[in-house]
């Protein structure tokens, strides 16, 4: 098969291929970028595979960086771009269900493509826009099927993360998982316990943000892969409710929103403890926790000025979007209106600070000063006190007389 035209992302990288070929080696575009070109999807990273060994690649180009030379990868800096050029290779036995014990460089493209995960990721594309398809990936692409390259059991036993990648591809491409591939995913799902949680997080996060995330969650359920992820041992009913609760075409707008929705559906009591196990950042944990808090109090009451001040209008709107997707009442206008009424959005905007109270009104550092500052802040937020020095000092004087 031949593409009707070579997408601009490949055209920009074409001089890399031409230089490698001029030096007497083979070179092709490979991987997900070729698949995305065939599907008319946006192309992101353009990867190049070559029969040139790393040291040979480095001799061809003036500017290179060793970013994974032991695995055959050299970063080529050319024409204002950065391109990963990886030598054709085969891989030895996988020792930890994630990484091969060793790699061997080869001159054969087919041997290199044989180690790929799925047939739709095992294409190569030459400089003439001709697609090399050694494993019937084009047929799978037409049929929207996700099939492992070769024996599915071997692919997942080599690298258990491919199970999560498969679920993610089902969600992002809207593909069905081929029967034997699905069976191998299910029988090897227990190996996910061997995979670093950081890598599992990346794949699950991408699944949640995919346009067809519901398909990915349904496959996660069907394979029972969720049982081997940290703190995800909930009943199938809770996972099914997660899918059922949201409008069919709903897409999450951020990772934080997606994880908040997940934890809400699974009824986790301690979201921050859960997210800590998934090795997420403190800021990520705080944001997810806040979204969960907002969603829960919105089931009981409407938004107040204090809520807008504490959480910020953007986070409140993000939580409101989850309500809208669950066909619950929303009030974006009230959030915007209350935000417009706030005299301050941060306590540092208050014109009087603790130092001034100590200097002019004799306060000492301690609980009394803290209580007074919080009272000033709350009164300004509630609109009961103007944010000017005269009003604040009078407010404090009145407090001291009570």
Curated annotation (Swiss-Prot):
This is CCA-adding enzyme. Gene3D superfamilies: 1.10.110.30, 1.10.246.80, 1.20.58.560, Beta Polymerase, domain 2. Disulfide bonds: none annotated. It catalyses: a tRNA precursor + 2 CTP + ATP = a tRNA with a 3' CCA end + 3 diphosphate; a tRNA with a 3' CCA end + 2 CTP + ATP = a tRNA with a 3' CCACCA end + 3 diphosphate. SUPFAM superfamilies: Nucleotidyltransferase, Poly A polymerase C-terminal region-like. Belongs to the tRNA nucleotidyltransferase/poly(A) polymerase family. Bacterial CCA-adding enzyme type 3 subfamily. Its EC number is 2.7.7.72. HAMAP family: CCA_bact_type3. A single active site specifically recognizes both ATP and CTP and is responsible for their addition. Catalyzes the addition and repair of the essential 3'-terminal CCA sequence in tRNAs without using a nucleic acid template. Adds these three nucleotides in the order of C, C, and A to the tRNA nucleotide-73, using CTP and ATP as substrates and producing inorganic pyrophosphate. tRNA 3'-terminal CCA addition is required both for tRNA processing and repair. Also involved in tRNA surveillance by mediating tandem CCA addition to generate a CCACCA at the 3' terminus of unstable tRNAs. While stable tRNAs receive only 3'-terminal CCA, unstable tRNAs are marked with CCACCA and rapidly degraded. Homodimer. It is an enzyme of class 2 (transferase). It comes from the Bacteria. Mg(2+) binds at residues 45, 47. Its cofactor is Mg(2+).
